[in-house]
Regions:
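Acidic, metal/ion-coordinating pockets
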Residues: 1-259
Length: 259
């Protein structure tokens, strides 16, 4: 039998959270989704607040993953230790709050979710994500499926990770760039892959940010606190991975773009 996993790209600002609230449950019903992972690291533009997290869970997320803005809102710190359904990149190390790996029971299967951050063009002193993935896969857990949200800038690093883990995990998707890619595929050994899910946020924006602010920065103006557009339609982007419980691997990938 197969199971459908929905992965949603970076939720950006109030527009993104509201868009998720409007569309997520309808898409889950329409596509017969069994488990949903949402990247929420930009829900407060830079970071995630406990209130944002509650809204995302209420909208239909089973797990929230994060990225380089994990600690953009420090009030999330205690929440990371208390809530096993929020994951920060595991390779940020053991000294920071939270975890980047969890195994969850969705009724049909036990699903492991890993959250890792890349090291190319990201100013982070993170552990090697490839070696961290190896360590997590050797942890002794025996889930039906294993999923990876790889929060990374470089397409090359994401693709290299996919080849490295092909056949060892069920699905890998990239987050962080906020731009959806058109390279969905099932790799030769059965791992489903998409370089980047895109984002959930304002349509008329620059990666979720008010266009005027972004333009001013590129013209030489001083950078400021990220602001989202006052008015814009929203979009929800991501992908559906269809997984086979007999093999633990992927049999199909479908992009999602709802407006």
């Amino acid at each position: 039998m197969t199971i459908n996993i929905l992965a949603i790209g970076d939720v950006v600002g109030g527009c993104g959270v509201s868009c998720l609230e409007r569309h997520l449950r309808a898409v889950k019903k329409l596509k017969n989704i069994h488990f949903t992972v949402v990247n929420g690291e930009n829900a407060a533009m830079v970071g995630l607040t406990p209130n944002d997290a509650e809204r995302i869970f209420s909208a239909g997320a089973d797990v929230i993953t994060l990225g380089n803005h994990t600690f953009g809102k420090m009030q999330i710190t205690d929440y990371l230790d208390d809530c096993p359904y929020i994951l920060r990149p595991h390779n940020l190390g053991a000294r920071v709050p939270g975890r980047g790996y969890g195994v969850f029971d969705c009724g049909r299967a036990r699903i492991a979710v890993m959250n890792l951050i890349g090291r190319c063009d990201l100013a982070f002193h993170a552990d090697n994500p490839f070696k961290t993935a190896d360590e997590l896969l050797k942890s002794g857990e025996k889930p039906t499926f294993t999923l990876l949200d790889f929060h990374a800038e470089a397409t090359s690093e994401k693709l290299a990770m996919a080849y490295y883990l092909d056949g060892r995990v069920s699905a890998i998707w990239g987050t962080h760039t906020h731009v959806p890619t058109a390279d969905e595929e099932v790799f030769p050994k059965g791992t489903g892959y998409l370089t980047d899910l895109g984002m959930t946020g304002a349509v008329r924006s620059v990666l979720g940010i008010k266009p005027e602010q972004s333009v001013e920065t590129f013209l030489g103006g001083l950078p400021g606190r990220y602001r989202e557009p006052e008015k814009s339609a929203g979009k929800m982007q991501g992908a559906i991975f269809t997984l086979d419980d007999a093999t633990g691997l992927c049999v199909g990938v479908e992009r999602v773009d709802v407006r």
